Amino acid sequence: MKHLTEMVRQHKAGKTNGIYAVCSAHPLVLEAAIRYASANQTPLLIEATSNQVDQFGGYTGMTPADFRGFVCQLAESLNFPQDALILGGDHLGPNRWQNLPAAQAMANADDLIKSYVAAGFKKIHLDCSMSCQDDPIPLTDDIVAERAARLAKVAEETCLEHFGEADLEYVIGTEVPVPGGAHETLSELAVTTPDAARATLEAHRHAFEKQGLNAIWPRIIALVVQPGVEFDHTNVIDYQPAKASALSQMVENYETLIFEAHSTDYQTPQSLRQLVIDHFAILKVGPALTFALREALFSLAAIEEELVPAKACSGLRQVLEDVMLDRPEYWQSHYHGDGNARRLARGYSYSDRVRYYWPDSQIDDAFAHLVRNLADSPIPLPLISQYLPLQYVKVRSGELQPTPRELIINHIQDILAQYHTACEGQ
């Protein structure tokens, strides 16, 4: 499993290539990604976050072993080679247990790392940047690095125990703000300074030495930094290369290291390409993919209303709204304003809090009902043109079947195509 170290080697040799990481557990998003990678004969990096998947089940109800089984089964059903599939764990550390004392939180983090590594995840992002209940705020670089080194030692030992070799690839550091898009309205964003990036690296190098982990330094392939990209509910802060140029140049002095950029969702194709050229060569994408899924489903729901008598419709949008109002915990603290503003945010926000609700059984039933209603007879071309114009062009040229499922998957793949192009290199 050397796809990532090989990518870094090529990038360092001047290829201006990169890799994107699909950060989603939604079956249709994953199917879209696997099929896209298969068609383009590229490796595929799929990541689970410590919120989604942990030793207790996370919010998806899946342990790392469950998630791996789920992804591998899907890949196998689509004839995707297992050796081209890379699984990553994102923000692994005490993130889920910040309300506990540090000793307890880190004991849980040890077990989290063990469960990810034992399940066969090979790209491990060590993130101990968050303060626990009895910690100072913010933590010093040294404390963060010591905790990361402790987890790296656990990871190495677990990997040797289960697989007989230590072949993990690590990412260290964190971005600001918190994972998953900003809560507040943004207008400008501080880019990580070269000094801060150097301090993080040196603190980690020193902490790894103290743990006797010198030999793994070449397998620390990336540092997470903030290149100045973010999104909130209705705005995107676009990458401005000039603001990140000093940071970009700084990493050129490290022969086995590139940068990883989080929250790259909704950047323009030109910005994505420039990020990779500027050594932010691992691009994380998640909400933009489920946002595209949601767009396609809303479009199909509108088509359904044109074609199917009201009483036979799935009512997907209303079911979704009702469930989100019944169980507001995933959006309530994120969306503000009056009732109408919050209604719009629930449906259309870039932060896409609706992604937490797709697994709900009522919503899943409505989705299945929608697909059944539209699969019974061909969808009229003018309606595809009206509601899914990008897919219409491909349907007309004969490259896309106009079935509900294929329309959804292709709409998601339009986003993946932007990332693929950005990462291809020269």
UniProtKB/Swiss-Prot annotation:
Biological or metabolic pathway of the protein: Carbohydrate metabolism; D-tagatose 6-phosphate degradation; D-glyceraldehyde 3-phosphate and glycerone phosphate from D-tagatose 6-phosphate: step 2/2
One Gene Ontology term, aspect cellular component: plasma membrane
SUPFAM superfamilies tied to this protein: Aldolase (SSF51569)
Intrachain disulfide bonds: none
InterPro entries (alphabetical): Aldolase_TIM (IPR013785), GatZ/KbaZ-like (IPR012062), GatZ_KbaZ_carbometab (IPR050303), TagBP_ald_KbaZ (IPR023435)
Highest taxon of the lineage: Bacteria
Family matches, as Pfam families: GatZ_KbaZ-like
One Gene Ontology biological process: carbohydrate metabolic process
Quaternary assembly: Forms a complex with KbaY.
Function text: Component of the tagatose-1,6-bisphosphate aldolase KbaYZ that is required for full activity and stability of the Y subunit. Could have a chaperone-like function for the proper and stable folding of KbaY. When expressed alone, KbaZ does not show any aldolase activity.
Protein family (similarity comment): Belongs to the GatZ/KbaZ family. KbaZ subfamily.
This protein's name: D-tagatose-1,6-bisphosphate aldolase subunit KbaZ
Phylogenetic lineage: Bacteria, Pseudomonadati, Pseudomonadota, Gammaproteobacteria, Enterobacterales
